[in-house]
Design a protein with these regions (language model features):
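N-terminal cap/lid segment of alpha/beta-hydrolase-fold proteins
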Residues: 33-55
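Short beta-strand element of the alpha/beta-hydrolase
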Residues: 59-67
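Active-site glycine-rich loops that stabilize anionic/oxyanionic intermediates
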Residues: 66-71, 186
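The serine-hydrolase catalytic nucleophile loop
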Residues: 71-79, 95, 195
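Conserved alpha/beta-hydrolase
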Residues: 87-100
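Alpha/beta-hydrolase active-site loop
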Residues: 106-126
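Short beta-strand/loop motif that positions the catalytic acidic residue
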Residues: 182-184, 188
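C-terminal catalytic histidine-bearing segment of alpha/beta-hydrolase fold enzymes
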Residues: 207-243
Length: 243
């Protein structure tokens, strides 16, 4: 049975690239032989790229948002290919293209959130995708971008965020939130668990549809078996919300 690829404990780990290189060689990509296609669209007068994985899949779309290390981390593509084997089409968005810097500033969050919203608009204009349901899946900084987009009542069917936070700029101008899954580590010293708890409280106050799980032994980034559990929870959540 094909298993999801393994992420390193932390994106900032100095040995991440070695771990990724080893893991990527072990991951059986031959199961999914199709090549990754690259497309572009305009957002805020800038050209933004995204990779399409699972183009032949007929199921829902997942817009995947990378973390602070950027889209070059190979295992994001590995996870995208794993989701494609489950009949999802994954759009791996290079949202950094939408701003001049990679800094997590209010200005950049606004540009990145707009890129996500504009990509959803592109999907709705595409005859092959216009009737498909859409989910957002973000990791760390990308999870914060997904939450920012969700807070503006973006017309998607689900949002899954792994160890992110809702940026203050978007917290204060909240418009809504699609059904949300929050996954976080109790010992996260990068984006603390208080951020997840704040979003959970917001969901209760606003009566948003929200599921959550706090891993008691995890930090920023999940190690097996928590990682495998997070993948399963995400797939189960999408299967239910995108049915």
């Amino acid at each position: 049975m094909l298993s999801p690829p393994k992420f390193p404990k932390k994106e900032r780990d100095s040995h991440s690239w070695l771990l990724l290189a080893i893991a990527i060689l072990l991951f059986p990509f031959t199961v999914l032989a199709e090549s990754i296609q690259v497309a572009r669209f305009t957002s805020g007068e800038r050209q933004v790229s995204y990779e399409i994985v699972g183009l032949e899949s007929s199921g829902p779309l997942i817009i995947m948002l990378h973390g602070a290390s950027g889209p070059g981390v190979p295992l994001y593509r590995g996870l995208a290919q794993y989701f494609a084997t489950k009949n999802y089409t994954v759009l791996f968005l290079h949202y950094f293209d939408a701003a001049d810097t990679f800094r997590a500033s209010d200005q950049n969050y606004i540009a990145w959130e707009k890129a996500v919203s504009d990509l959803v608009g592109e999907c709705r204009k595409n005859p092959k995708w216009s009737n498909r349901k859409i989910a957002l899946l973000g990791f760390s900084l990308g999870a914060s971008v997904a939450l920012a987009a969700g807070s503006q009542a973006i017309p998607v069917n689900a949002v899954a965020e792994w160890y992110g936070s809702l940026p203050d700029e978007f917290f204060f101008r909240l418009k809504g939130m699609p059904p949300l899954l929050i996954l976080h580590g109790q010992h996260d010293d990068n984006i603390t668990v208080a951020n997840a708890q704040q979003i959970m409280q917001l969901c209760r106050m606003k009566s948003f549809t929200c599921g959550s799980h706090i891993y008691p032994d995890q930090g920023h980034g999940f190690k097996p078996p928590a990682y495998d559990d997070a993948v399963k929870r995400t797939l189960d959540f999408f299967s239910y919300q995108l049915r």
